[in-house]
Every structure is written in C-alpha cells, then in structure tokens.
C-alpha cells in the first residue's frame, strides 16, 4: 500500500514531489496570473476613457466592469502571495516598451494591502452586482458576494481576524432574496460539484466541453510509477483513508462505493491500501460504473462552507471561550453535513483539532 500520493515522475507534480523543481517547471510559474493582472490593469486604466468616446458605454456599465477587474486582480495577487509570498506588484498595464520589465518584489504586507484596497474600491462604486443574467454568469463572474469572500480570505491571511469575521458575516448573515447559502442537507453536497453552480457556490471558474471545447484537466489525477506498482488506482493516504472510514456514519459498503468506486468494472478489495478517488459517484449507485470522457467540471474558488470555515478560524485565532464555542458550532455544521460526528468539547488544547 501507499501512505502518500505518488505522482507520475516526469510531470510537474512529480518534480515537486521529488524536490527537483526548476524555473522551467510549469507548476511553479506565475506568468498566467500576471496575464490576468495585465488585462485587469488595462480595464482599470482605460475604461474611463471609453465613456468619452462611446456614448453607448454608460457609467453604470463601466463601474460594474471595474468591480470585476478589481476582483480578478486581487484574487490573482492573493494566489501569488500565498504561493510565493513576495512578488512584483504591478498596477499599470504594459502598453509599450517603455514599461519596466525588471520589477523588484514587493513585500507580502504591501501586496495584501493592495488586495484590500482593490476590494474596497470595487465595493465603493456600489456597482458590484448580486446576480447576473444566467446562473453561470452569477457564479462565474465577480459579484458582491465574491468580493466579500475575497476580502475575508485576504484578511485571514493577513491575520486581521476581526475584519475577516466582519466580511464573512456579510455573506453568512445576508438576507438578500438571491444569495449564496450553505446547503446543510447531507444529500445536497453532490450538486455542489455536479453539475456545479449550486446555491452554495460563490465563485467558480466555468468550463464547458460540449459547447466551447473547454476543459479544466484532471488536477487530482496522480498515477503511480515504478515497476513494483501494478495497480491502476489513485494512490491515496492509507492512514487518512482509515481515519475517514472510522469517522463516517454510514456503513462500510456505502463508504466503499461512494468514496472509492471503481473504474470500468474493475473491483478492488483492499480499499485503504489502494483507494480510488471518485468524486462523481452520486448516491445509490452500488453497481454503476463511473466513466467520464470529458474533464469540464468547474473549478470552485469560493463557496459558503469556505467562508464559514474562514470565520471559524478567525474566531479561534482571536481567542476566548465564547469565540471558541461559536467556532466549534460552525465547524460542527460542516461536519454534520459530511455525516461526521460533531465535536462537543472545546478547550485551549483541542480547539485547533476541531
């Protein structure tokens, strides 16, 4: 069996696993993020000038577009700071050769403050939408809810815990008629991932293989390598697999078919050692095979469970028995939806384990 995830040796994931990362390794390059940042910078700089030249481009449209540009720039920088900590901070578009290309790195603090400034600027326009026309747009474009989620995560990363709670509560306590909501019924979780764009979703990258030939790849597909590995499975952590089985409410057979599954009728009897990760099993499908020919599942950036756990972590970091109790209540809502046993004790010693 295997106690670690074992990627293919020649892939970027394999290079990371084997500590052989090079500057050319695609998984550690930040160019794509700066492409997004560059486009956002161009919108922020030139959109105001378009109004002067195009009478059909209204102020309300421009303000709405600016909120989306602020969000995409902020989200890109948050991913960069989480992965690289210090990166070049660029807020102007590259339009000619006069722009510098050798830009020094900015500090983590500077970048986080820029993200906060972008979110505040977006919200200050009062043009951030709660919904767009069509579910895919509401979940796939930057809404007011997405801005709140981005700010909550940025504040959590910056250790501004009180502000994190504030922005998380803007989502959790909202009474807007159309808003993201936590899906508390255990059987509903499946809809979050398939078909996606669920009520719980806040922002997710849209893929559509059927209509637009778009595919997100298979980020969880890690194949074994080595002559001693003969099973055609995803290698999964044996200790964590056993721990999940022990904590799961449902019986062994239910765990096996909904969590492990099988490929094209191949049956595996040694589940903890050779577990198969199968997200799209659904319910009541003990004899159904899971074969997907396309890889266009949306990539979920934020959903309500994420925001709730952000608030819980912030409350834990703030400290105090009242905050710990509230944090544990939030965590238990997530656990109970996953049909895991709730935790009923809270102390300075165990709160971080909840």
PLM regions and their residue ranges:
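Conserved, well-structured interaction surfaces
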Residues: 7-84, 106-110, 119-132, 285-299, ...
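Aromatic-residue-lined binding/catalytic grooves and analogous aromatic/hydrophobic interfacial grooves
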Residues: 1-21, 41-49, 78-92, 112-136, ...
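A glycine-rich, coil/turn loop motif that links secondary-structure elements
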Residues: 58-67, 133-146, 347-352
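Short linear capping/connector segments at secondary-structure termini
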Residues: 21, 56-58, 92-99, 136, ...
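Short coil/linker segments at helix-helix boundaries
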Residues: 86-109
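Elongated scaffold/linker segments in the mid-to-C-terminal portions of large proteins
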Residues: 1, 8-32, 48, 169-319
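Cytochrome P450 fold signature focused on the C-terminal beta-domain
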Residues: 184, 341-349
């Amino acid at each position: 069996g295997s106690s670690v995830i074992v990627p293919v040796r020649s892939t970027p994931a394999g290079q990371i696993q084997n500590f052989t990362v090079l500057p050319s390794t695609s998984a550690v390059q930040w160019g794509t993020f700066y492409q997004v940042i560059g486009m956002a910078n161009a919108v922020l700089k030139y959109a105001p000038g378009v109004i002067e030249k195009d009478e059909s481009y209204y102020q309300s449209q421009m303000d709405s577009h600016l909120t989306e540009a602020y969000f995409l720039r902020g989200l890109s920088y948050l991913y960069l700071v989480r992965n690289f900590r210090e990166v070049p901070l660029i807020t102007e578009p590259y339009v000619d050769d006069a722009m510098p290309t050798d830009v020094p790195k900015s500090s983590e603090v500077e970048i986080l403050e820029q993200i906060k400034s972008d979110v505040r600027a977006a919200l200050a326009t009062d043009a951030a939408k709660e919904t767009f026309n069509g579910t895919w747009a509401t979940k796939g474009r930057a809404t007011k809810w997405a801005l709140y989620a981005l700010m909550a995560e940025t504040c959590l990363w910056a250790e501004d815990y009180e502000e994190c709670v504030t922005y998380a509560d803007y989502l959790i306590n909202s009474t807007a008629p159309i808003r993201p909501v936590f899906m508390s019924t255990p059987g509903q979780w499946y809809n979050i991932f398939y078909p996606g764009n669920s009520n719980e979703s806040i922002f997710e990258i849209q893929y559509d293989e059927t209509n637009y030939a778009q595919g997100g790849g298979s980020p969880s597909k890690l194949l074994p390598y080595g002559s001693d590995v003969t099973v055609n499975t995803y290698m999964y952590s044996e200790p964590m697999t056993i721990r999940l089985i022990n904590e799961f409410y449902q019986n062994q057979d239910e765990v096996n078919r909904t969590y492990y599954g099988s490929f094209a009728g191949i049956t595996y009897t040694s589940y903890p050692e050779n577990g198969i990760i199968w997200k799209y099993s659904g319910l009541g499908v003990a004899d159904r095979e899971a074969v997907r020919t396309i890889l266009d599942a949306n990539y979920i950036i934020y959903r309500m469970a994420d925001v709730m756990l952000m608030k819980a972590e912030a409350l834990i970091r703030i400290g105090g028995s009242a905050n710990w109790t509230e944090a544990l209540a939030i965590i238990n809502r997530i656990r109970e939806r996953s049909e895991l046993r709730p935790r009923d004790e809270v102390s300075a010693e165990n709160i971080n384990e909840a």
